[in-house]
Amino acid sequence: MTFKDFDAEEKLFLRRVIVAFGVVVVCFGILIFNLYNLQIRQHHYYTTRSNENDIKMLPVAPTRGIIYDRNGIPLVRNVTWYDIAVTPYKIADMDALLKQLTPIVDLSPDDISDFRRALKSSSRYRPVVLKNALTDVEIARFAVNQFHFNGVTINSYQDRQYPYGAELAHVLGYVSKINDNDLKALDKKGLAENYAADHNIGKQGIERYYENDLHGKTGYQEVEVDNHGRIVRLLKDVPPIAGKNIHLTLDLHLQEYIESLLAGQRAAVLVEDPHDGSVLAMVSMPSYDPNPFVKGISYQDYGKLLHDKNLPLINRVTQGLYPPASTVKPYMAMSALLCGIITPQTTFFGAPTWTLPGTQRHYRDWKKTGHGMLDVTKAIEESADTFFYQVAYMMGIDRIDTMLSQFGYGKPTGIDLNEEYDGLLPSRAWKQRVHKKAWYQGDTISVGIGQGYWIATPIQMVKAMVALINNGKVIAPHLLLNEESGKTVVPYRPSGTPAQIADPASPYWGLVRQAMYGMANAPNGTGYKFFHTAPYGIAAKSGTSQVFSLKENQTYNAKMIPIRLRDHVFYTAFAPYKNPKVAIALILENGGSDGVTAAPIMRKILDHLFDPQADTTQPDQAP
């Protein structure tokens, strides 16, 4: 017979009740903690997530400002396109989606690979563009099937179009797709939010330099959407603010005329108003069409441009680096006069060669018979090398560096473009730093005629000439005429006070300008037969930049050497002489081709500006 131990059973039951109660308490504790965590600690997070399901903030892109020439001619257009975009978090099977969309919107393998690449660097909650520039047929096909594709939308956007193509590419630049580097830069500046609705950003030229002004301010719409992502109603609308319109100093008709003269050449021309630095024309040949860059140029096409031996991507006006040659002789003369090295009455005998004192090193003059007795005026008129060898020897490299840097050589000009090279005005310190060698007197002699280590851009040559025209007032070139926002027009204002070289009242300024006039108008001047008939008066200075050095007993013959080893030819000029309205620099790389020569082109440009009815038939060869 079995007896029950009621006390033991009661204790066991109580233990089980206590354990069960403890488990219930723990479960309720966990539940209460989670409720607290969800309702209190993460209230803001889940409220936001909940609102995102039905309340959306849609950024609205601003209209990009238009760029005009000085006469009000629009140089760019804004055109409306449509893209198709996918919001990743709404898509369960991305591969299946892409397969379904391919026949509807004609997706190419490149479209899909670009999209997958963009997915990796994008938030899954933000739409990612699948394809740009949809056709009307593609839009219609998708509209019929749209209800099948939750998370896929078609959006309109504006793109840039450049109707003048290659003619203005180096000035206007272009806009192109915003890439990761752009986003990082925008984020660093606190501007990323302002590009939430944009595809493109300025990458080159005026489009890049004035990006902040042209872009405008992004607006937004607060909308309520259903569970399919369709807009139910508009809750709030903050319209975007359009970008500013920009008027350039450029004259489109002059630009086109100069380009017609340089067709087929590797060349550059800059035309500037010497009174305020306004750029009237900036031509660099050859050029490129900026339109393919807007939607994204192919690697193959970009590679062709990048490796083209004629360098179409380079703006030769601001990035072309050349020994400035004899175009610097007026500024060398001016510097020597200001430093007291020479006077207007100083004379040297211009022999066929000049010998460096204490050596047997001979430096040749371009004129085999020499020039006879020379003062500074005649030396500039005849571009006498031997005179400037002597001047450079007497000045020394330190004074040359100090004076010529004031004319703007060896540093940026201040032009409102990012694409500019500094050039190089050599100095004793530079050679030691770069070449680890001492400076020799022979180096100085070559610098005296704009050769040797010295390299400059055409825009630097014009800046120096503008300083000469303005009695030493150094004026920065610029492309901006004014900015327009609604009815408000803000004209260009230079930053800071222009630098002044020496005394503006010095008579030497006029003396050197007169010598440049003599170069073009005196019978002994090297440009006489090209320019002396101009009724408005031209002052000029030519230059020939060596591509390779000749041996002491070697004679230069352009017809006997390859084209790309021939000398570069420069012309700088200002006109009308008594009241200059333009300062111009022209370069023909390797002396031009197909019978094109520098002096006649310069004369044609000036006649086009000041004597359009003139007969510009000129001699075939430059002196």
Swiss-Prot record:
Enzyme class of the recorded protein, top EC level: hydrolase
Reaction catalyzed: Preferential cleavage: (Ac)2-L-Lys-D-Ala-|-D-Ala. Also transpeptidation of peptidyl-alanyl moieties that are N-acyl substituents of D-alanine
Active site feature: S326
Highest taxon in the source lineage: Bacteria
Documented EC number(s): 3.4.16.4
Transmembrane segments: 17-37
Chief place of localization: membrane
GO biological process, one term: cell wall organization
HAMAP family (alphabetical): MrdA_transpept
Family that this chain belongs to: Belongs to the transpeptidase family. MrdA subfamily.
Protein name: Peptidoglycan D,D-transpeptidase MrdA
Organism: Salmonella typhimurium (strain LT2 / SGSC1412 / ATCC 700720)
Gene that encodes the chain: mrdA
